[in-house]
A protein has these predicted regions:
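Short glycine/proline-enriched coil/turn segments at helix->beta-strand junctions
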Residues: 126-127, 169
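Substrate-gating cap/lid alpha-helix
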Residues: 138-170
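Surface-exposed alpha-helical segments enriched in charged/polar residues
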Residues: 18, 119, 123, 162-166
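Conserved SGNH/GDSL esterase-like catalytic core that processes O-acyl groups on lipids
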Residues: 28-119, 126, 139-141, 156
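Proline-centered loop/turn at the N-terminus of a beta-strand
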Residues: 129-131
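Structural motif
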Residues: 23-24, 83, 123, 166
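Alpha/beta-hydrolase-fold catalytic nucleophile elbow
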Residues: 94, 133-134
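Membrane/wall-proximal cationic-aromatic binding patches
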Residues: 1-33, 75-78
Length: 170
């Protein structure tokens, strides 16, 4: 895993965590993790949130995942309002798996959908940094003769990863 923050957007967040760790900060640091079934499954977010809480103490880690979600799933005003109501210090956006499973995946459309979601979140949370994650590797399944299934690496996942990285770097 690699965390890229070439312009230092996350510096204020890291400073809040540092102050929390030193016992100087009294406010709870709030992280909201938004995404698809990887987030909805709770295993990764609960493990991450628990580790962060044990390490830093007064930290709230809320996951908002929806099975089968795309970026556009969260562009509804009520969903953006739900995220904003949590008053996060950091928003983590984890999408791309479901987008890349579409055999007609369109990176331009995916980019625009990310742009729409981030613009909506920026209006409600103008000073909150956003961290974008990329999807894990996945497989496409194919039915062969005699109803046997075979699997091969989904080639669209790497395109989705490149699209997300390009968007995050813009």
């Amino acid at each position: 895993n690699e965390l890229i923050d070439s312009v230092g957007i996350l510096k204020p967040f890291w400073e809040k965590l540092r102050m929390l760790r030193l016992g100087i900060a009294v406010d709870t640091v709030r992280i909201v993790h938004v995404g698809d079934s990887h987030i909805r499954g709770h295993i990764f977010p609960e493990t991450t949130g628990g580790l962060l809480q044990r390490t830093f103490g007064a930290l709230s880690y809320t996951d908002m995942g929806i099975n089968g979600a795309f970026c556009t799933t969260f562009t509804r005003p009520d969903r953006v309002a739900d995220i904003a109501a949590l008053h996060p210090d950091l928003v983590i956006l984890s999408f791309g798996t479901n987008e890349s499973h579409n055999r007609r995946y369109n990176s331009i459309l995916h980019y625009r959908q990310m742009e729409e979601l981030v613009c909506m979140l920026r209006k409600s949370l103008p000073d909150v940094p956003m961290l974008m994650t990329t999807p894990p590797g996945s497989y496409d399944s194919f039915r062969q003769r005699r109803r046997r299934r075979t699997y091969k690496i989904n080639p669209r996942t790497s395109v989705a990863v490149q699209t997300i990285r390009r968007f995050a770097d813009a």
